[in-house]
Amino acid sequence: MRKLNSLVSLVLAGLLVIGCSNQNQTEQEILSAQALYTQAQTQLEKGDYASAIASFEKMGSRNVQANLFGEQIQLSLIFAHYKTGEYYKALSLAERFVRAYPNSNNMDYVHYLVGLSNVRLGDNFIQDFFHVNRSSRTIESIRNAYGNFQMIVRIYPQSQYVNDAQQWMVYLLNRMAEHELSIVKFYDKRDASVAVVNRVEEMLRFYPASKSTFDALPYMQKAYQRMGLKDSEAKVAELIEMNKAKVFPKITKPEYSKQF
């Protein structure tokens, strides 16, 4: 019995030593995580995005650090990849973030970054510089961006990003209308009258206040004329006459804030 008691005492003593050792190790890991996080944030604030990405990814691969700063690490990585022009990577990380933190208080910020990433994917520096109209380019990223900003306005009406989101929505809606007008012109050149009429009808439904929709009406009138539908042609002519004095506001592209 005495040997057993001695053995139990030795085991308990050993567990106590191990417990203290584990506690010290955890405290050291926490301090290390805090130091690395501070370093990564400093790199991010200085615009050294490549180094910040490397630091945040290093933290994300360690359990203690990932548990302590997991959400903030992912937010910072989304932002850093956006700033380096890696928009598809930013979108991928954002999608992962939404799955991992569905109840995050930063969800409006994530949707805002996703929207800006999609806008950037629809941009082209050279075409911007020479004022080239991009309405005929693939419009998918623009539609996605509109949906991202619309989500902020609808679901997060108190968000600090609502005003910016609304401005982007006006601009993007105009871009989509311009794209539809380019398709109408394409069909008109090929005398595809039915396609012209169908497309303009969609514009009247989805972009009724757009200048591009008004500019599409003469193509619709001509299409009805080609098809010999005089009543429909006359109705469109009347619609054109009613709106000929209408002044459309100039829609300019919102500026990216310095932060983004």
From Swiss-Prot:
Predominant subcellular localization, coarse grouping: membrane
Keyword entries, A-Z: Cell outer membrane, Lipoprotein, Membrane, Palmitate, Signal
Record's subcellular location: Cell outer membrane
UniProt xrefs under Gene3D superfamilies: Tetratricopeptide repeat domain (1.25.40.10)
Highest taxon listed in the record's lineage: Bacteria
Residue numbers with lipid attached (N-palmitoyl cysteine): 20
Positions where lipid (S-diacylglycerol cysteine) attaches: 20
One example of a Gene Ontology biological process annotation: protein insertion into membrane
Segment forming the signal sequence: 1-19
Assigned protein family: Belongs to the BamD family.
Known partners and oligomeric status: Part of the Bam complex.
Function comment: Part of the outer membrane protein assembly complex, which is involved in assembly and insertion of beta-barrel proteins into the outer membrane.
Protein name as it appears in the record: Outer membrane protein assembly factor BamD
Organism: Haemophilus ducreyi (strain 35000HP / ATCC 700724)
